[in-house]
UniProtKB/Swiss-Prot annotation:
Organism: Christiangramia forsetii (strain DSM 17595 / CGMCC 1.15422 / KT0803)
Database matches in CDD domains: PheRS_alpha_core
Protein name (Swiss-Prot/TrEMBL): Phenylalanine--tRNA ligase alpha subunit
UniProt lineage: Bacteria, Pseudomonadati, Bacteroidota, Flavobacteriia, Flavobacteriales
UniProtKB keywords: Aminoacyl-tRNA synthetase, ATP-binding, Cytoplasm, Ligase, Magnesium, Metal-binding, Nucleotide-binding, Protein biosynthesis
Cofactor: binding details: Binds 2 magnesium ions per tetramer.
Catalytic activity from the UniProt record: tRNA(Phe) + L-phenylalanine + ATP = L-phenylalanyl-tRNA(Phe) + AMP + diphosphate + H(+)
Length: 339
């Protein structure tokens, strides 16, 4: 029996193969579940005691020789293929590679982030589940303030003080609490409002809000920053600011960009005016600065905010906001080129 095993060792050491199939057949012959090695191991119990030590040694030698031979043959085959450039038919078409696409909301968010990063703004983030102080009170919206009715809010049933944030201004409050001026930050993120879902509104959407706090910041600084943004994102260099109201800024304004009236689509989306509303803005209210332990006599600043979905709808001429959330591949695959 021992001589028979030694004969197999010699066969293993002299074996050669030229293909993967031959190597695999060799591996199965010796190392497979029904291979020669397992047959010898099964015979171990029938070997006389005085021969068991030597029998075990030669079996292990056969196993090691087979494993070494398989590995060596595989390595030689790979090396030979690389040297000869043998990878099959090189004219054969490659297997198709499925390439994904970024979501249009992510594309626009990244574009906005890059534009403001180029002028020194960093990115700040905060929790989507927020408390009353950071979402309302610190932003000059005390309890029972009538402006709270502007935002229909989702409250947490077990704790009325906890809610789903209605804007990313709450992130700005947290940032001002933790950082001293000068401050230049934008806060992109998801927000929630209890609104009816339609082609123009949704209960979940995304915002980018910006904040700039420093000494001697003026309304003109804000206008110039917004003008830079519209030129970079839309390629439009004409804007107008209309008086508006936001509890956390004073004075406040709505920003319109002149879209033009060159096409039928321009007439439709601007309702014949040539102007499109894109964001709100204003000088940070002194009460907000005080609530965040910033002295309004020393510092001033401006804030702005926009809906990412609205910007994406303008850029890509999308008429229904619900399309962003339906995960329809026919829609999403159209943005592969925007990676």
């Amino acid at each position: 029996m021992i001589d028979k095993i030694k004969g197999h060792i010699a066969d293993v050491e002299s074996f050669n193969a030229k293909t993967k199939d031959e190597i695999e057949a060799f591996r199965i012959k010796y190392l497979g579940k029904k291979g020669i090695l397992n047959d010898f191991f099964a015979e171990f119990k029938n070997v006389p005691n005085e021969q068991k030590k030597e029998f075990g040694q030669v079996i292990n030698e056969l196993k090691t020789a087979a494993q070494v031979k398989v590995n060596a043959l595989k390595e030689d085959l790979e090396n030979n293929q690389e040297e000869k450039g043998v990878y099959g038919d090189l004219s054969r078409p490659a297997e198709p590679v499925e390439i994904g696409a970024r979501h249009p909301i992510s594309i626009v968010k990244n574009q906005i982030t890059e534009i403001f990063s180029n002028i020194g703004f960093n990115v700040s983030e905060g929790p989507e589940m927020e408390d009353d102080w950071h979402n309302f009170t610190a932003l000059n919206l005390p309890e029972y303030h009538p402006a709270r009715d502007m935002q229909d809010t989702f409250f947490i049933q077990t704790d009325p003080d906890i809610l789903l944030r209605t804007h990313t201004s709450s992130v700005q409050v947290r940032y001002m609490e933790e950082n001293k001026p000068p401050i230049r930050t934008i806060s992109p993120g998801r927000v929630f409002r209890n609104e009816a879902i339609s082609a123009r509104s949704h209960c979940i959407f995304h915002q980018v809000e910006g904040l700039y706090i420093d000494k001697d910041v003026s309304f003109a600084d804000m206008k110039q920053t917004i003008l830079y943004f519209t030129e970079q994102l839309f390629g439009k260099s004409k804007i107008r600011l209309r008086p508006s109201y936001f509890p956390f800024t004073e004075p406040s304004a709505e920003v319109d960009v002149y879209w033009g009236l060159e096409t039928e689509t321009d007439y439709r989306i601007t309702k014949g005016t040539g102007w499109l509303e894109i964001m709100g803005c204003g000088m940070v209210d002194p009460n907000v600065l005080r609530n965040c332990n910033i002295d309004p006599k020393e510092y001033s600043g401006f804030a702005f905010g926009m809906g990412i979905e609205r910007i994406a709808m303008l850029l890509y001429q999308i008429e229904d906001i619900r399309m962003f959330y339906e995960n329809d591949l026919r829609f999403l695959e159209q943005f592969k080129s925007a990676l």
